[in-house]
Amino acid sequence: MIVAKKYFLVLSFLFVQFALLPQAFSADKGWFDTLKDNVSETWQQPEHYDLYVPAITWHARFAYDKEKTDRYNERPWGAGFGQSRWDDKGNWHGLYIMAFKDSFNKWEPIGGYGWEKTWRPLADENFHMGLGFTAGATARDNWKYIPVPVLLPLASIGYGPATFQMTYIPGTYNNGNVYFAWMRFQF
């Protein structure tokens, strides 16, 4: 039963990621050209600079032995910097680099491009929610700091320049299955 729940959860996250991918890319161009253009525009014409502050990592208890979760660090401290912009549809694009203490309390850098389809469901335009993805690379101590590509879902809720942004890293038993969240302050 736990295995079925685990696979359902992983497949759900993958489905959401791939369901949102086409919205990030224009219908006129291929997805790679659109991605390249969005990254380039975010790099060359940022509207904001962002401060990233890691808030929490949580290891899904259904996917880990208790003795492992008892040893893991779930309070990552660190910081990051980025630049971002809002496109003409109101969607968020960002380039970022962040370093934080991982599950083993070792430094883990991550950097990449993020995109979120953004909704402003209230009359107050400052309140916003988003769903999207991030693509980039990370490196970990237990993998000898060899860069590893990442493609992960993103979700956020925010008010004005402060956004609580999060992802879920899928995995297998005693590996992965981690919720990771951070604050993003836009300047």
Curated annotation (Swiss-Prot):
Which residues are the active-site ones? 59, 102, 103
Q: Which reaction does it catalyse?
A: a lipid A + a 1,2-diacyl-sn-glycero-3-phosphocholine = a hepta-acyl lipid A + a 2-acyl-sn-glycero-3-phosphocholine; a lipid IVA + a 1,2-diacyl-sn-glycero-3-phosphocholine = a lipid IVB + a 2-acyl-sn-glycero-3-phosphocholine; a lipid IIA + a 1,2-diacyl-sn-glycero-3-phosphocholine = a lipid IIB + a 2-acyl-sn-glycero-3-phosphocholine
- Region forming the signal peptide: 1-26
Principal location class: membrane
One Pfam entry for this protein is PagP
Q: Where is this site: Role in the phospholipid gating?
A: 173
Q: Which InterPro entries match?
A: LipidA_acyl_PagP (IPR009746), OMP/PagP_b-brl (IPR011250)
EC number, as in UniProt: 2.3.1.251
For this UniProt entry, the molecular function terms from Gene Ontology, in alphabetical order, are: acyltransferase activity
Give me the Gene Ontology terms describing cellular component: cell outer membrane
Location of the protein in the cell = Cell outer membrane
The UniProt similarity line reads:
Belongs to the lipid A palmitoyltransferase family.
How would you summarize the oligomeric state and partners of this protein? Homodimer.
HAMAP family attached to this UniProt entry: PagP_transferase (MF_00837)
Q: What is this protein called?
A: Lipid A acyltransferase PagP
Question: Which gene is this protein's source?
Answer: pagP
